[in-house]
């Protein structure tokens, strides 16, 4: 499985609770935080749900 590098680029202020929970589940808390995950169907679904808040790159 490929690894993806995920960066939070937009604020969570004013977002719906489920979107905030999704970003937190990815391990992101503040703007500029970067995490690496294996690209599983679960992670891909979370990325698609809040894609407008994130920058995603191949690691």
From Swiss-Prot:
One MF annotation (Gene Ontology) recorded for this entry: structural constituent of ribosome
Keyword Glycosyltransferase among record annotations: no
UniProt xrefs under SUPFAM superfamilies: Ribosomal protein L30p/L7e
Key words, A-Z: Ribonucleoprotein, Ribosomal protein
Source taxon at top rank: Bacteria
Swiss-Prot/TrEMBL GO biological process terms: translation
InterPro entries to which the protein is assigned, alphabetical: Ribo_uL30_ferredoxin-like_sf, Ribosomal_uL30_bac-type, Ribosomal_uL30_ferredoxin-like
One GO term describing the cellular component: cytosolic large ribosomal subunit
Keyword Membrane found: no
Subunit structure: Part of the 50S ribosomal subunit.
Family indicated by similarity: Belongs to the universal ribosomal protein uL30 family.
NCBIfam families hit by this protein: rpmD_bact
PANTHER family: LARGE RIBOSOMAL SUBUNIT PROTEIN UL30M, MITOCHONDRIAL RIBOSOMAL PROTEIN L30
Protein name: Large ribosomal subunit protein uL30
The organism of origin for this protein: Clostridium botulinum (strain Hall / ATCC 3502 / NCTC 13319 / Type A)
Encoding gene (name): rpmD
